[in-house]
């Protein structure tokens, strides 16, 4: 009977070898790196429809780097953002530089609105005056002042006329008439109220400011011109 029990015990141990290889409770089992890779391959074979998002999660869980395709897409995205920012900066910057490098005429207009006369102009009362040195016909003088964003010299009152007469002995003013039978008018089409020493000569249809007053002259004569514009305060 004792022999049978001994034989039975040996057979039981032989059939259940795990009991002979029990590990202490304090040690934890771990899966090697090779086993993890095998697990991943088996997972991919079993689930071929896994998308990139699922694969990324697996990589993140294991502390591995993302696939190179994802890194390439991120780099291309950053490059696109930088290029777009550069293009937008250029679009905004170019008009700004063109505005700063605008023509002197634009500078003259700004000076008028800022309440200051441009350089080489003089200020009297509430107006700016350009004292020209070139001799031109009446029509040429009118065009020259227009190019300076101003008008050919005009006279508002007697005091201004006396002041201007001291600056130049003779200069065109923005007053004319169609013929000796027509009244004197300004370039704005308004009737001119100041007296002009007239002549019966049919060709003297433009007005000139002299030291002694206003006088009619031939419009084709070459005379010094002055320009004027109002200050906007």
Curated annotation (Swiss-Prot):
Compartments (UniProt record): Cell membrane
Glycan attachment points: 100, 178
Domain of life: Eukaryota
Membrane is among the record's keywords: yes
Domain C-type lectin: 116-229
Membrane topology: Single-pass type II membrane protein
Cystine crosslinks: 117-128, 145-227, 206-219
Pfam families: Lectin_C
Ranges of the Extracellular topological domain: 94-233
Example of a GO biological process term: positive regulation of natural killer cell mediated cytotoxicity
Assembly and oligomerization: Heterodimer with KLRD1; disulfide-linked. KLRD1-KLRC2 receptor complex interacts with TYROBP homodimer; this interaction is necessary for the expression on the cell surface.
Job description of the protein: Immune activating receptor involved in self-nonself discrimination. In complex with KLRD1 on cytotoxic lymphocyte subsets, recognizes non-classical major histocompatibility MHC-E loaded with signal sequence-derived peptides from non-classical MHC-G molecules, likely playing a role in the generation and effector functions of adaptive natural killer (NK) cells and in maternal-fetal tolerance during pregnancy. Regulates the effector functions of terminally differentiated cytotoxic lymphocyte subsets, and in particular may play a role in adaptive NK cell response to viral infection.
Protein name per Swiss-Prot or TrEMBL: NKG2-C type II integral membrane protein
Species, as recorded: Pan troglodytes (Chimpanzee)
